[in-house]
Amino acid sequence: MKKSLILTFGSLFALLAGSLPAPAQVQAEVQAFQQSAGDRSILYRGKRGARYTILANGHPYWAQPGFERGDIVFEGNLYYDVPINIDALAQRALVQLQDSPFSVELTPENAPAFTIGDGHFVGIGPGGALPEGFSEVFGDGPVHVYKHVYKLLSSNTQNVNGDPIGYYDPDYRNDVTRHFAIRKVYYFRDAEGNFSRFKGRSALIRQFQDRKRIRQDVKAIQRRQPDLSFDDFCKAVLHSAAQ
């Protein structure tokens, strides 16, 4: 583990003290957190997660700003039911402190696997087969699809809410030129463990020998769900291929 991720409760909250009202309140929060965290405490001894103060439309998170409950592997231990999110700009997993607006960040190497809601994620360190950061994994069989999401801080004087930035911001401001744009990259992992990047629905189906049957199965699903998202399309293809 890198030294920057081994902070005691005292040093962690010393970093936060400048943003909190008074030392007595800081100490009270430290004590309350230590009591509530219990054997999870080591999970929270990380560097404080970034709190972006720049004025920009959108947000830097994977899907939404709020935290969701999930399970996470950290230093070989599995921790259940902790509030997790992903900073897609910095490619860091965020774990929210108990009863606090603050979070700690974990690198991909230190958070190799976790769940957020129904999603399953893996952390990829430098030199891996996939881009460094976090990817969501689809599929339970011998083949998988990996979805890598990252955010970029961009600038545009036009109204780019919605498709141009990749998602809709209900609080979009036309007088703000900077925004967090989203990018999504998909990879196919075959049964031998080889990765290949693909773009589009047909490209995924071409990865399989039994593509004719898979295409028929997926078309039947699309007739029932004409607005099937690309992620759900990937899951449907993998489910059909596993039959």
What are these language model-derived features?
Residues 8, 65, 179-181:
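A generic structural signal for short, non-catalytic loop/turn and secondary-structure boundary residues
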Residues 8-17:
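Bacterial N-terminal signal peptides
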Residues 196-243:
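Long, compositionally biased interface segments
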